[in-house]
Amino acid sequence: MEKITSFLQKWLWLIALILFALLAVFAISMATPTAVCASYGGPEPGVTTFYQAYQSANDALLILGACSIVITFLFKRLRSSIRPIYYIGNFVSCAAVGIMGIASGVTTLVATSRYQAGYATLPIDAMNQYWLDHGSNVTIEKSPAIFPLGYILSVCLVLAGVAAFVLFALKLIARIRYEKSRKGEAE
């Protein structure tokens, strides 16, 4: 059990930091394939509003990513990655990383699936033809790589959150054992 705790303490903050940074980058790049929808002048209704409709999801993911990065730095700053005896700050920061990991993963999954469903309704062939007719070399892919990346990232975020809760439980068990051993020595 100590080896698992030691491993998670040592690497969880770095893995979480990388995943939360990737979430922020993902949020920034999520709508990139359809940014050109804002300038589309074709006859299909709803295309120009498609891009704006998903900006709130991008904003939410970006805010989650930024807040999660701050919480992960707090985890590291409270020395949750090296303390052998656990104090309340260790438990709070560990639980916060777990909550943010799971919340970010679920939010990313929902946002990606909704965005993909909306993307599937776009008249991509007509849009590509419109830009070709107007002398632009802009094209929209029928299935951009952003969707599988979103699903993979969401699973990784949830797994990081679960790992943080496992670490929380291991720290709690270690703290209980520590308190019992102190009581045994006092008697």
Language model: regions and residue ranges:
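Charged, low-complexity cytosol-facing tails and large interhelical loops of integral membrane proteins
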Residues: 139, 146-147, 154, 181, ...
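Loop-to-transmembrane helix junctions at the membrane interface
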Residues: 72-101, 105
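Transmembrane alpha-helical insertion/packing segments
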Residues: 1-62
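Helical transmembrane-bundle signal
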Residues: 16-27, 65-72, 97-104, 108, ...
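Interfacial non-cytosolic loop connecting adjacent transmembrane helices
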Residues: 34-55, 106-150
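Structural motif marking the loop-to-transmembrane transition
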Residues: 1-11, 58-59, 81, 85-88, ...
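Alpha-helical transmembrane segments of polytopic membrane proteins
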Residues: 54-65, 147-159
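Cytosolic juxtamembrane helix at the C-terminal end of the final transmembrane segment
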Residues: 2-5, 12, 74-82, 108-119, ...
